[in-house]
Amino acid sequence: METALSTPVFARRNVAYACATLCCLLWGSSYPAIKSGYELFQIATDDIPSKVVFAGYRFLFAGALLLLFALAQRKPIARLTPTQFGQLTILGLTQTTIQYTFFYIGLAYTTGVNGSIMNATGTFFSVLLAHFIYHNDKLSYNKTLGCILGFAGVMLVNFHSGIRDFRFVWNGDGFVVLAAFILSAATLYGKRISQTVDPTVMTGWQLGIGGLALVAGGYATGGTLEVHSLTAVAVLGYLTLLSSVAFALWSALLKVNRVSMIAPFNFVIPVAGTVLSAIFLGENILEIKYAIALVLVCSGIWWVNK
């Protein structure tokens, strides 16, 4: 159970804004970190099973870390009904296993800059799904305009050498977009579960279950993960920490705040992903199309939540 003070703390606007910004900064930093991890663990671009193993260990460790944290807070992590455990299993397999399988594969076939912006489509998928799921969250003029602006930005980033040369790599950009859609649907499902299961416990179980499935699936299909340096371990450790902290915080924020208040902070993700990819991976962000695309994506998210 949560303490009496946890809900009002996360419900305070300044705390909620700070935590939401931190979550999105962490998620944005995952783009260059994942690509660096591939290099440090010497995972080839076409070695999909090893990428799945890499993802699995990240989330398995993150889930275990969160459950240990919940135990330290004396939260009951095993007092789950069969129905609740089934819900957490479904959440873990969708939000972690399936979603990140597409995400990791997709990121290997696109740039960190493209990946961070393509993944921003998740905000617009959330708006569209909410229209069909919640009676009090229908599409409006602002939301429709926001979706159009956001997808315009996503399309722009894939234009190369002029409008006639449109480039969209299905197993790269397409998989990142598909991962964003799956995450949006799973997040709405997780919001419902968090009303009966503590957000930290829920996130720990779903990351652990999803991560274990990724590890098993990766090894079963011929994947491996060999440690070649302490730097590689440090990168995996960073990805583990950002997953546990960001997902747990985000779940706690969504439980006690309106989605429309927290969602606008998603604009930090493509911005952070683009800037950090340029800094750590040496990718080019000096093309004017990237600046315009980021403005369109951020404007779209702002209009959706206006």
Predicted region positions:
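Glycine-/small-residue-enriched transmembrane alpha-helix faces in small-molecule transporters
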Residues: M1-V53, D165-R192, L212, A216, ...
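Hydrophobic transmembrane alpha-helices of multi-pass small-molecule transport proteins
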Residues: L66, L128-L129, Y141-H160, F267, ...
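Loop-to-transmembrane-helix transition segments
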Residues: V15-C24, A70-L71, K75-F102, N171-A179, ...
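Hydrophobic/small/kink-forming positions within alpha-helical transmembrane segments
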Residues: G28, P32, L60, G92-T97, ...
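Small-residue-rich packing faces within the transmembrane alpha-helices of Major Facilitator Superfamily
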Residues: G28, L60-A64, F151, G211-L212, ...
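Helix-helix packing/entry segments at the starts of transmembrane helices
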Residues: Y57, T96, Y100, N114-T121, ...
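Hydrophobic/aromatic residues within transmembrane alpha-helices
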Residues: G37, F54, G106, F132-L139, ...
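Transmembrane alpha-helices of multi-pass small-molecule transport proteins
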Residues: L40-T97, F125-L129, I182-A186, T203-T221
